[in-house]
């Protein structure tokens, strides 16, 4: 192997010319192997140093190392140039013309159940009521026992209620928001005027008029001297807020374990799609004395009323929605008409 300065200079010159001709990074990588790899002339020159006489080996080594450094520098410079060209091309390709009209992003919509729940809350807060909350995983004591449900009441069966494992834990997914009544009476000073809005769970099949997970609004008032007249006035105000100023209510005798007397509420209103008439809306009544006693309240001193309505049902008949499944499928096309980005 010729280790003269002339031979090494020729090898360096060949490498420089080759690197300069490289049109892209892939081509440069191939040329690097050819001129700086283990079988390249400069690599073979380094291997040949072993055959050089000892008194000449140091000078020869310096020449070989200098030549290789020059070739490496030529490679590094061309590599930097090609990378700069690539980055510039990417910037041009991805350049954004800020003068062009922007691409409009789709606007989301809040779910109509959320909108209805917040409107109901605002209505009662304006009347001086407060909001109350309770857990969705509830104790059987609050869901049934404290609400005067007898031990053999059919609502306690697994055909109607989701119980939490293990068996015998007496924990369940609340079947109504009425447990908030008891928790509120135990936790707050009287008088009490609260509403609770939240999810409830029953073993219903999802169809056009039923869903296993639905929302309820529960109203509770306990004070001295409350009567059915106060309940009727509250229901009428609630109905007008949700169904329009012409709406009115009527009540029909019914039975609920936690109220006495109990009634079902019908509402008359003009529908959003035309037509007017009476529709069953929910349940109501005077708080049962046993419920007051369970909360440590003397029913001879205090009385109260309660009412409860389903939000999905309210939305369905108020807005003429034929299929309740539309409310749970998450299709934004269903939610948009109720309030874009509301």
Curated annotation (Swiss-Prot):
It comes from the Bacteria. Its EC number is 6.1.1.20. InterPro entries: aa-tRNA-synth_II (IPR006195), aa-tRNA-synth_II/BPL/LPL (IPR045864), Phe-tRNA-synth_IIc_asu (IPR004529), Phe-tRNA_ligase_II_N (IPR004188), Phe_tRNA_ligase_alpha1_bac (IPR022911), Phenylalanyl-tRNA_Synthase (IPR002319), tRNA-bd_arm (IPR010978). Mg(2+) binds at residue 260. It catalyses: tRNA(Phe) + L-phenylalanine + ATP = L-phenylalanyl-tRNA(Phe) + AMP + diphosphate + H(+). One of its GO terms (biological process) is phenylalanyl-tRNA aminoacylation. Its cofactor is Mg(2+). Binds 2 magnesium ions per tetramer. Tetramer of two alpha and two beta subunits. This is Phenylalanine--tRNA ligase alpha subunit. The lineage of its organism: Bacteria, Bacillati, Actinomycetota, Actinomycetes, Mycobacteriales.
